[in-house]
Structure formats: structure tokens, C-alpha cells
């Protein structure tokens, strides 16, 4: 698993267990990045990003509408593949995350 995935999953406040929407989106994009050109099915994203099936569907719809991932419908499932725009967004988000952590802020 991508080492940056663990950075996104770290909790700055151990008593607070919830991720922001941006944290969830970053987790989904990280899974999509790890899967590369072959893409990821919903169950794989759900398992690796620790989200329900329906939460993954909702977020992937938003990411597809924004052009950050593309959806390919197979015989039995959807495959989600990160786009070039999604890769650029994810890289910029990683830089932002590092900056935020360096000044001890929680996004």
C-alpha cells in the first residue's frame, strides 16, 4: 500500500475518529493510484479505504463528475481508474497535507 496512504489515515486527535470529506477523497484517490491503469472495483476501494459500499459509490460519483476518476462498467461491476487530472489533484493534495501537518493544523 502507498506510504502516503498511511499519512492521510493518521489521526491528529486520537479521540476523534472521523475523517473529513477531503480525507476520504484522498483515501479513494490513493487506492486508485495504487491500482494504476487496471483500476479498482468498488469492493476493493471499500476495503482499502475503510468505507461502506454506498459511501464509495457516492464519493466515486463526485470524483467522476469532477473528472478525477473515470468509471468503466464491466459485466458485473464498475471499475474506477484515476485520470491525469486526478493524479495532478492527488499530488497537489499531498503537498497541501504535508504543509498542514508541518504547522500542526487539522483540515
Predicted regions mapped to residue ranges:
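Basic, amphipathic "hinge/linker" alpha-helix immediately C-terminal to the N-terminal HTH DNA-binding motif
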Residues: 75-91
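A short, conserved structural fragment
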Residues: 64-74
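N-terminal helix-turn-helix DNA-binding core of bacterial DNA-binding proteins
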Residues: 16-51, 55
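Basic amphipathic alpha-helical segments that dock to polyanions
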Residues: 45, 56-66
Amino acid at each position: 500500500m502507498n506510504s502516503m496512504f498511511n499519512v492521510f489515515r493518521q489521526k491528529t486527535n486520537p479521540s476523534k475518529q472521523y475523517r473529513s470529506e477531503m480525507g476520504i477523497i484522498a483515501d479513494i484517490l490513493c487506492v486508485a493510484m495504487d491500482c494504476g491503469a487496471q483500476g479498482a472495483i468498488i469492493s476493493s476501494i471499500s476495503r482499502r479505504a475503510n468505507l461502506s459500499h454506498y459511501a464509495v459509490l457516492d464519493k466515486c460519483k463526485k470524483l467522476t463528475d469532477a473528472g478525477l476518476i473515470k468509471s468503466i462498467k464491466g459485466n458485473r461491476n464498475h471499475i474506477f481508474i484515476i485520470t491525469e487530472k486526478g493524479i495532478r489533484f492527488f499530488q497537489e493534495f499531498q503537498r497541501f497535507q504535508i504543509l498542514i501537518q508541518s504547522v500542526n493544523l487539522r483540515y
